Curated annotation (Swiss-Prot):
Motif (YGL motif): 448-450
GO BP: permeabilization of host organelle membrane involved in viral entry into host cell; virion attachment to host cell
Region span, Hydrophobic: 389-409
Name of the protein described by the UniProt record: Outer capsid protein VP4
Species of provenance: Rotavirus A (isolate RVA/Human/Thailand/Mc35/1992/G10P11[14])
Site (Cleavage): R231, N232, R241, E242, R247, A248
């Protein structure tokens, strides 16, 4: 079928007038510029592997166990436990306020009798009396002195099996742990001038907030969590704990991440939302005393306001959801006042406001995440509406009010008369407010909510102030705008029709008679005979055929054919006939990316299978240069398409161009191709299978890749309608003559029809399998 379309393209049978070009341009702008639906309304997924990046948050998430940090000297923050985890005996840490307090902590190993040891404390070498009588517990000893040149005295001890100690500055005191684990508890020593007290640690340490003192006590008595004792936990410098404070601007653009083609931009904007309700009041026929409907309608509103000195043009669409229907009937007479239905929004209702403005934030609002908004509440109060009766005093509906509170924000698309806009949809929940509404001269009163009769109360608009923030994936080039879903409804209707037509086409495969299919495949089909089953005029068929040609010219198959044609043209311009024949083959082989290599290059059967598969996918184009009088896969595809077009009940002029171009690429995807050399046949399949066999006996022989490479360059490439497996199965079970074998190898339609008419199950099954592959 593709070759049929290809040959008619080459023959220039069809032309395009200016009206066709205008229609095509309009179709591109209105129907074909679409984005695949994504998780938000009419947006789509990004065309890259898009991670969430770093998320900014105003909440300080404080870890319970912060560390470990490398040994250092620093001013320990107030209200933080410094949990020290030494790995060797000796000095653990020391500190001072530089005036009247010097303190130091040392670690003593097991089984140490009362002895003097030498330590370097406060830059001086001192002798301290230490001991540890326990054979199972390590011992921390806290020493303190009150003068620069004074003597250290023992203050408290902590015996532990976990080699952990801790202290904290709080309320003018130094707190530490004392006792014996697992019953150690905190104690304190009075000190002054905590703000200038520096601490020097000789071991790794952790910081724990005072609010987690209970957990710190648990660590002292029972040890650190298992994760902290692995070799993968690496201490870091204390400087990594520094927090840099920054204040976000109300209106700013921040580059979150950036690659060569795309970047993530965070847009922070303060906005002013102005909106108004629209309503529809319909009066019934008759004497003029009855109304059939009072309802809310969507309302578009365009306005300008100033943001940071810049004039912003904004567009909003206000709509309601979850309305409540009320009725009023004053009596059965034609002159009795009555309202068949009037709408009221109450607590169970929602108001949606779609907002768009001309700022950079909305220019590429297609791929969006981290969307948040903060808006004010607004009170909407109803006004008076007089029902003009032919005679008598007018009933007046008055009052009613609701408060709109923000309930969320999502993405949406606004459709105006000229363009569709990717916008933000702000959702508001409602709460009823005073006053209630009533209708004068009736018993209807004391009802809460906002009726649709006069929801704007003569004000020009309602206004909400607030701000929003979002992160959008946009092109790195600021001059490029990401396409949005223009006229998406038109395209969706067409896609729905195409989907239904595809289902019908696929279901019709079982209704095709095999014998008639072979006859139809041998006919010289053209485009006009293809559409003979469609009720239409000749001019309509011409127009439809032109559209099919346009669709086909933009397909992947047509592009590959164009490359092949260029190669043939280059070869035809060669000087000698023999050179041109070789040029056709070599250029074609190059264009179709023939990756066949010889001998030593084919190390494994897997390599050969991959290369053969790549060649088989491209031999379809090579087949165009060697058209024969026998059947090809495209002949069967065209016959199946013709049969299904005749049987279809849903085909139309708008859908047939898509169906034909799609069929030319998708019908019979699992094809097998054959080249022959005297008594040897070579077959390759799309699935990577390949066979070489004797034609007279169908005995398989080794596949000569070098010979195959030469044959596909110089010899005709045939469609293997009846492939090697089917032929061998047929010969083994039924026995066939050499003449029949040659005709089946060449896909002779007469021989195929004879086997089908004789109900040969093997041949019928093969043809039915090909028909089943003609799917969309």
């Amino acid at each position: 079928m593709a070759s049929l379309i290809y040959r008619q393209l080459l023959s220039n049978s069809y032309v395009t007038n200016i009206s066709d070009e205008v229609s095509e341009i309009g179709a591109r702008k209105t129907a074909n510029v679409t984005v695949n639906p994504g998780p938000f309304a009419q947006t789509g997924y990004a065309p890259v592997n898009w991670g969430h990046g770093e998320l900014s948050d105003s909440t300080l998430v404080q870890p319970t166990l912060d560390g470990p940090y490398q040994p250092t000297t620093f001013n320990l923050p107030i209200d933080y436990w410094m949990l020290i985890a030494p790995t060797q005996i000796g000095r653990v840490a020391e500190g001072t306020n530089t005036t009247n307090r010097w303190f130091a902590c040392v670690l003593v190993e097991l089984n140490v009798q009362n002895t003097q040891r030498e330590y370097v404390l406060d830059g001086q070498t001192v002798q301290l009396q230490v001991s540890n009588d326990s054979s199972t517990l390590w011992k921390f000893i806290l020493f303190i002195k009150l003068e620069k040149n004074g003597t250290y005295t023992q203050y408290s001890t902590l015996s532990t099996s976990n080699k952990l100690c801790a202290w904290m500055k709080r309320e003018g005191r130094v707190y530490s742990y004392a006792g014996v684990t697992p019953n150690a508890s905190e104690s304190y020593y009075l000190t002054i001038n905590n703000d200038d007290s520096n601490v020097s640690s000789d071991a790794e340490f952790y910081l724990i907030p005072q609010s987690q003192t209970e957990l710190c006590t648990q660590y002292i008595n029972n040890g650190l969590p298992p994760i902290q004792n692995t070799r993968n936990v690496v201490p870091v410098s204390l400087t990594s704990r520094e927090i840099r404070h920054s204040r976000a601007q109300m209106n700013e653009d921040i580059v979150v991440s950036k690659t060569s083609l795309w970047k993530e931009m965070q847009y922070n904007r303060d906005i002013t939302i102005r909106f108004k309700f629209a309503n529809s009041i319909v009066k019934s026929g008759g004497l003029g005393y009855k109304w059939s409907e009072i309802s809310f309608k969507p309302m578009n509103y365009q306005y300008t306001y100033t943001r940071d000195g810049e004039e912003i043009t904004a567009h909003t669409t206000c709509s309601v959801n979850g309305v409540n229907d009320f009725t009023y009937n004053g009596g059965p007479l034609p002159t009795d006042f009555a309202i068949s239905r009037f709408e009221v929004i109450k607590e169970n209702s929602y108001v949606y406001i779609d907002y768009w403005d001309d700022s950079q934030a909305f220019r590429n609002m297609v791929y969006v995440r981290s969307l948040a908004a903060d808006l004010n509440d607004v009170v909407c109060s109803g006004g008076d509406y007089s029902f003009a009766l032919p005679v008598g005093a007018y009933p007046i509906m008055s009052g009613g009010a609701v408060t709109l509170s923000p309930a969320g924000v999502t993405l949406s698309t606004q459709f105006t008369d000229y363009v569709s806009l990717n916008s933000l949809r702000f959702r508001f929940r409602l709460a009823v407010s005073e006053p209630s509404f009533s209708i004068s001269r009736t018993r209807l009163s004391g009802i809460y909510g906002l009726p649709a009769a006069n929801p704007n109360n003569s004000v020009e608009y309602y206004e909400i102030a607030g701000r929003f923030s979002l992160i959008s994936l946009v092109p790195t080039n600021d001059d490029y705008q990401t396409p949005i879903a223009n006229s998406v409804t038109v395209r969706q209707d067409l896609e729905r029709q195409l989907g239904e037509l595809r289902e019908e086409f696929n279901s019709l495969s079982q209704e095709i008679a095999l014998s008639q299919l072979i006859d139809l495949a041998t006919l010289p089909l053209d485009m006009f005979s293809m559409f003979s089953g469609i009720k239409s005029t000749v001019e309509a068929v011409k127009s439809m055929t032109t559209n099919i040609m346009k669709k086909f010219k933009t397909s992947n198959l047509a592009n590959a054919i164009s490359d092949l044609t260029n190669s043939m043209s280059d070869a035809a311009s060669s000087i000698s006939r023999s050179a041109s024949v070789r040029s056709i083959g070599s250029n074609t082989t190059m264009r179709i990316s023939t990756a066949i290599q010889t001998g030593e290059d084919l190390r494994t059967m897997t390599d050969a299978s991959t290369q053969i598969s790549n060649v088989s996918r491209s031999l379809r184009l090579r087949e165009f240069t060697t058209q024969t009088d026998n059947l090809s896969f495209d002949d069967i595809s065209a016959a199946v398409l013709k049969t299904k077009l005749d049987k279809s009940t849903q085909i139309s002029q708008t859908t047939i161009p898509d169906i034909i171009s799609e069929s030319s690429e998708k019908f019979i995807p699992m094809r097998t191709y054959r080249v022959m050399d005297n008594d040897t046949g070579f077959e390759t399949g799309i699935d990577g299978t390949f066979y070489a066999y004797r034609i007279d006996t169908f005995d398989e022989i080794p596949f000569d890749v070098e010979k195959f490479n030469r044959l596909i360059t110089d010899s005709p490439v045939l469609s293997a309608i009846i492939d090697f497996k089917t032929l061998k199965n047929l010969n083994d079970n039924y026995g066939i003559t050499k003449t029949q074998a040659m005709e089946l190898l060449q896909s002779n339609p007469r021989t195929l029809k004879e086997f089908i008419n004789s109900n040969n199950p093997i041949i019928r099954n093969r043809i039915e399998n090909l028909i089943a592959q003609c799917r969309l």
